[in-house]
UniProtKB/Swiss-Prot annotation:
GO molecular function: rRNA binding; structural constituent of ribosome
Protein name from the UniProt record: Large ribosomal subunit protein uL15
NCBIfam families in UniProt: rplO_bact (TIGR01071)
Any one cellular-component term (Gene Ontology): cytosolic large ribosomal subunit
Organism in which the protein naturally occurs: Chlamydia trachomatis serovar D (strain ATCC VR-885 / DSM 19411 / UW-3/Cx)
Subunit structure and binding partners: Part of the 50S ribosomal subunit.
Stated family: Belongs to the universal ribosomal protein uL15 family.
Residue ranges of the region described as Disordered: 1-48
């Protein structure tokens, strides 16, 4: 059973904050732990992350290695047959522009893959070579 007198503070004890500028015997008097002169002694100074006192910082001393392909990667999105059923009418042309106009795909997208999920009841005209159909979708289109 929990008793009122047995309750403990859940947070860990906090270290006492240093009293600054309260005489030489406190250990943090006069310059208040800031040292003499320089940027750090001035009010309002905040050292930026990675700053090493004016020397060449570590991130510039370490050589760059490798290559990142993310800038050049083609953006490919997937779309289901169920979603195409909702968006397009019977006999509509399916192209990247049509999908972008309807805000189904992102404007940066350069390729779309159509995946079989649900039925595709409508006869659609595939206009774009950038739209790739999965094997299941191809067989479904032939059946329709």
């Amino acid at each position: 059973m929990i008793k009122l007198e047995c309750l403990q503070d859940p947070s860990p004890r906090k270290r006492r904050t240093k009293l600054l500028g309260r005489g030489p015997s406190s250990g943090h008097g006069k310059t208040s732990g800031r040292g003499h002169k320089g940027d750090g002694s001035r009010s309002g100074y905040k050292r930026r992350f990675g700053y090493e006192g004016g020397g060449v910082p570590l991130y510039r001393r370490v050589p760059t290695r490798g290559f990142s392909h993310t800038r050049f990667d083609k953006c490919v999105e997937e779309i289901t047959t169920q979603r195409l059923n909702e968006i397009f009418d019977n006999g509509a042309e399916v192209s990247l522009e049509a999908l972008k106009e309807r805000k189904v795909i992102h404007r940066e997208t350069s390729r779309v893959k159509v995946i079989l999920k649900g039925a595709l009841d409508k006869k659609l005209v595939w206009k774009d070579a950038a739209i790739v159909l999965s094997e299941g979708v191809k067989s479904l289109i032939e059946a329709v």
